[in-house]
């Protein structure tokens, strides 16, 4: 889950309104304004006829303008973290935050057909972009540990940072693994994340983070369905 709920943000002002009828009416008025005032009422009457060739040209012009505005909106959104997707988000993450999309599962060319690599989701990459600012400090904030844990390996999914009140410097960093059956992290992944959190430039000198896997609770539901 991202540290910011993008759905609560208002639509950016640079996103243009897409209203065909409004554009079409603007086109008609601009066309009429090209003629002397004595002829404008005549043209206004002519343009009420759907079959008139000039109306058809203005309709096409308005539709092309609608498509152009839609493309401008898409281009603008591709530059915003809240909206960018796919390769647009890759470029934004690299140029603005210095991050690249991590691999969850490497490609396997030994099978037929070859299995392509699986990369982290757009949502996860957005979260790392937001958390990257917390990663610039070594004050030991929970979000800083989240950032470094997520960046350690693309398989890291959920993260919970906790400490006891009487020993706040002893931290448990509990992780889940995205590609495991029950979410439990493997020993290999735990070791990778632990190595990422141990360096002095990552944690305060007094912090002792310990990475652990979450524990899965198996349960069975018995239900009676009435139809």
Locate predicted features.
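N-terminal polar alpha-helical/low-complexity "assembly arms" that mediate subunit docking
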Residues: 1-139, 146
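Carbohydrate-recognition loop of C-type lectin domains
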Residues: 134-227
């Amino acid at each position: 889950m991202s540290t910011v709920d993008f759905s609560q943000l208002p639509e950016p002002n640079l996103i243009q309104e897409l209203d065909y009828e409004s554009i079409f009416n603007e086109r008609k008025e601009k066309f009429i304004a090209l003629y002397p005032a004595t002829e404008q009422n005549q043209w206004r009457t002519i343009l009420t006829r759907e079959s008139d060739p000039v109306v058809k040209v203005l309709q096409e012009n308005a539709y092309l303008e609608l498509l152009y505005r839609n493309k401008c909106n898409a281009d603008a959104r591709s530059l915003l973290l809240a909206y960018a997707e796919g390769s647009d988000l890759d470029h934004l993450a690299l140029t603005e935050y210095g991050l690249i999309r991590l691999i969850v599962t490497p490609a396997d060319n030994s099978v037929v057909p070859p299995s392509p690599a699986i990369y982290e989701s757009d949502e996860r990459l957005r979260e790392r972009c937001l958390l990257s600012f917390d990663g610039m400090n070594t004050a030991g904030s929970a979000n800083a540990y989240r950032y470094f844990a997520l960046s350690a390996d693309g398989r890291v999914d959920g993260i919970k940072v906790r400490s006891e009140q009487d020993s706040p410097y002893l931290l448990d960093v509990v992780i889940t693994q995205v590609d495991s059956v029950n979410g439990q992290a493997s020993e290999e992944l735990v070791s990778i994340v632990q190595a990422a959190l141990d360096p002095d430039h990552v944690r305060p000198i007094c912090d002792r983070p310990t990475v652990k896997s979450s524990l899965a609770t198996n349960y069975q539901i018995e239900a009676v369905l009435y139809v």
